[in-house]
Amino acid sequence: ENYPRTLDLLNKWFALESNPAPEPYILQAQVFYQLQRYKEMVAPIETAMRIARERDKEAKEDWYVLLNFAYFQDENYAKVKDIQKILLQNWPKKRYWFSLAGAYTELGDDQNLIAAYDAAYTQGMLEKENEFVTMAQLYMQREVPYKAAILLQEQMEKGVVKKNEKNYRLLSQAWMLAQEDDKAIPALQQAASRAVDGELDVRLANSYLNIGEYDECVSAANDGLRKGSLKNPDNAQITLGMCLYNLRKYSDAKKAFQAAAKVQKSRRMSNQWIQVIDAEVERNRQIQLKLRRDGPSLSDLPDFIVSFMH
């Protein structure tokens, strides 16, 4: 179509018309749109809205959509935000929530960004996997990982969010940040079983260490070291050593700490653990020597036997 010709005719008509209705101004804005003269769209749309108000008429939804587009092209996100609020107030639709969220993203307003997602979720407007995953990530950014974990868990159980390594990894991270290691473990197990590298196995080992499940900790740490491709294998060795120490497997624990000590940043901690192990082994050796020489004394016997004897 000949949009420049249309624009020229409109301008001539405006020059002759003393009291135009809103619609011709909207037509003018649409012509500017077709000509990709987006900044020039704003004035006629706002004029149309002003005339509508003066005549006690409501501005139409598509007028606001057109104005929103013009401001978006001009990267005026503050105006985009304001228009989306009007659209939501009068025509609450899913796409307007996400447009509002996009404006908050561009403005760096994380608090209101999450509020927009929350409102969309409360109204049942979140449907797709990426929408729920994005919302969970926003919760974690705002340091409310428990809500992120609950959201992901629910949507994975419903089948909306896929049960893959990436999503299980995110779920486990949310539970761990919420200091819910017992709930992080099932997600970590699922993620680790799907992972090629050993990072998630080591993370799983740390969760087992935190809740005192030392046999499982050893198994997971060894799996991680076996798979390899670890960013910090020394940390994996330290975790393994701590779990072995708690199982009183001092020789194996010492080997793990010796392996970790080969890395400069872990050397001091590892050597401290080695000293603790050596001291514990020596203490046990002295006890055994004393028992062989003198027989058991009350101080060498377990507390429950001493109590029984008394």
Identify the role of each PLM range.
Residues E1-N246, D252-Q286, R292-H310:
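Alpha-solenoid helical repeat scaffolds
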